[in-house]
């Protein structure tokens, strides 16, 4: 009886975690297929932050303007900003380096499959990087941000939502545990939380605050912040 219960427990554990790769990657069909539901379970504020991004796109997008959605995944931002794109005859270029994500993309606009490190942005009005930089090699993050600040139009904006380092000491520990608690309360199993945390080792690294000295904070939830760079009206 005890052996049967043990076997059942392992079967349940495997069924909950079998889709999680040993080394986290978005170049994975199972990850792409689970992405939309999983990210909302893991980050209960995901849709709230999406609405915030859409608000700032509306605030900075001129008529006939261009939005870049960099690290577009399956099209979350594209769908959120469709109303303002339609109202202002705006255009969208969505960029992602995962063929698996691209196969499920439904955010509208033009989809470009490219590594952000290699992507040279055209002149644009608004760029969005929504939970992207933490998955990019730290040595290459500044290059991406510098290119964007060079290419953004006068009066435009760069909008960031990403994970940042926790403060030192016990408060930092408590903030991280808040993130874990939010996941558990959203229905993510403890086994899935643990496997995902181990999978992310070396694959997801918080973004250094020093990269954003000229950005303004508009959101903070636990380990995550929303920032915006408003481009000067005269460049």
Give the location of each predicted region.
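Conserved alpha-helix/loop element of class I SAM-dependent methyltransferases that forms part
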Residues: 45-63
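A short glycine-rich, Lys/Arg-flanked "PGG" loop and its adjoining helix->strand segment in the class I
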Residues: 142-154
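A conserved beta-strand element that flanks and buttresses the S-adenosyl-L-methionine
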Residues: 128
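Class I SAM-dependent methyltransferase SAM/SAH-binding core
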Residues: 68, 73-118
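Class I SAM-dependent methyltransferase Rossmann-like catalytic core
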Residues: 17-50
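C-terminal alpha-helical "lid/dimerization" subdomain adjacent to the S-adenosyl-L-methionine
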Residues: 163-211
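Conserved beta-strand signature within the Rossmann-like core of class I S-adenosyl-L-methionine
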Residues: 155-163
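Core SAM-dependent methyltransferase catalytic element
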Residues: 216-235
């Amino acid at each position: 009886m005890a052996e049967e219960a043990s076997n059942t427990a392992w079967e349940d554990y495997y069924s909950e975690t079998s889709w999680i790769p040993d080394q986290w990657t978005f170049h994975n069909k199972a990850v792409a297929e689970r992405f939309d539901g999983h990210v909302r379970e893991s980050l209960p504020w995901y849709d709230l932050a999406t609405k915030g991004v859409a608000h700032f796109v509306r605030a900075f997008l001129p008529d006939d303007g261009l939005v870049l959605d960099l690290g577009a995944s399956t099209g979350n931002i594209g769908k959120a900003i469709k109303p303002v794109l339609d109202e202002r005859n705006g255009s969208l270029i969505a960029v992602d380096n995962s063929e698996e994500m691209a196969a499920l993309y439904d955010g509208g606009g033009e989809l470009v499959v490219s590594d952000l490190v290699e992507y040279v942005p055209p002149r644009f009005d608004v760029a969005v990087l929504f939970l992207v930089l933490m998955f990019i090699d730290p040595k290459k993050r500044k290059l991406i941000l510098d290119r964007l600040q060079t290419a953004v139009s006068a009066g435009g904006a760069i909008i960031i939502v990403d994970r940042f380092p926790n403060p030192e000491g016990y408060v930092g520990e408590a903030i991280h545990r808040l993130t874990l608690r939010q996941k558990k309360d959203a229905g993510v199993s403890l086994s899935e939380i643990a496997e995902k945390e181990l999978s992310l080792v070396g694959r997801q690294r918080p973004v250094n605050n020093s990269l954003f000295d000229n950005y303004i904070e508009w959101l903070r939830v636990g380990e995550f912040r929303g920032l915006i760079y408003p481009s000067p009206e005269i460049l």
